Amino acid sequence: MQIQIQVLNQDELTQVHERTLRILVHIGVRVESAQARKILGDAGAHVEEKRRIVRFPQTLVEESLRLAPKDFTLGGRRPGWYWPMNHGDCTLLADGEAKWVVDAETGKRRTGTEDDWLKATQLIDALDEIGVYWRMVSTPPPQGKPRGKVAYWRNVFTHFTKHVQDSTETVEQSRWLLEVLQIVFGGREAVKLLKPFSFLVCPVSPLVIEGSYTDAYLQIIGWGIPAAIMPMPIMGMTSPARLISTTVVGNCEVLAMLCLVQAAAPGTPVIYAPALATTEPRTGRYTGGAVEHALLSIAATQMARFYGLPVEASTGGTNEYIPGIQAGYERAINWTLPTLAWPDILVGPGLFEGSTVLCYEQLLLDVEVFRHCRRLHLGIGTGKDQWLEEVIARLGPGGNFLKHPSTRDALRLGEWHLGTLGEPEVFQKKLGLLAEARGRINEILAARKPLPLDEDIDQELVNIERRAQVVVG
């Protein structure tokens, strides 16, 4: 049977839901967007305009949950690539927004560059285990300006061919984004059908739906673009100092935003995606390596399944800033448990030190950890062809199973997971794991087959970029 790990039983999941309803009904959420308050008020929420507090009747929450699709498929530009949500498989989403990069030559930390962004983007595009894009390196150009955003999206869709998850900061940026999506994917209806892009929307903890980003999101409503709702409550800082209460706060924030999404455009796909986190209590800093991240991630996955919603789970990372023993054990613990809860999307490969430092070698090592976790999830098969009683009877006491065809068949069918890094001959050659990973990265990038945009599409994007430049002067 497959392994499906849990940290909350059915009664505890129900308690999270019921306590969430009480908070939404009696305490509410501060909604900074006037447009969002009006949409929610029209849908039946109780709006206290002066304090910008919105309270959500239980009937509104339950109807919004009913309206949210329980399964849909994410697409991308690559022909034949798609990712069905809520269909029993898991893909990786590359972690994002690193400011620094571990230099492959010196091993030292330096500021990330556009070349780093390009290398990281091409690498994750080439790795089959990574199906969803975030910007791994926060690049220097002024991304806040429309021209910078259009140029950025042109580069994204040129170099990454699977599913893109991103956001905008302003209504104006959202308008440019919709133009880009129409050009790249062939119009509004094609975007609605293919779902090549999902919008990351992040309520602010505790219990705030902020203004600018929410208005930016509402600009794309009606295009069928999935909303990945990712509040980031931090235990002991922006949520109470208990794992279960942090789970409740995150759930409140997701459901409040889900109500807004469904009120604005019923049937819009939603991804349940809270990034529940904790701190280092001795310093107050966010700590990626704390084992509690794994527990919180599993709880979030379970709540999504409780509602029947697709889920994007965030793992913990590591407190370390270079590859090594600490990074290894923190990653293994914080990845194995959430993966065994089996979300649709798992966020996290490639970054160190609270998701601020990119390391290419660690990215590849994280993918290898995920491959091992995926094998663990499969568990022990017990189908009728798995027991091999007839083979045991045929070979009998003292028999040699190594040369029997059933052993070969089991190997070919995946009964063993064969790792691709850290093979014995590597150590005999005294390469070391990082050197091996570095060599493998070069091989992957050399073998990658680019899928450039059609010339006419690329030229139209250039034209949009020029128009955006005129707008900003």
Annotate each PLM feature:
Residues 11-16, 28-41, 48-50, 88-93, ...:
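N-terminal glycine-rich anion-binding loops that anchor highly charged ligand groups
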Residues 53-240, 244:
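Catalytic alpha/beta active-site cores
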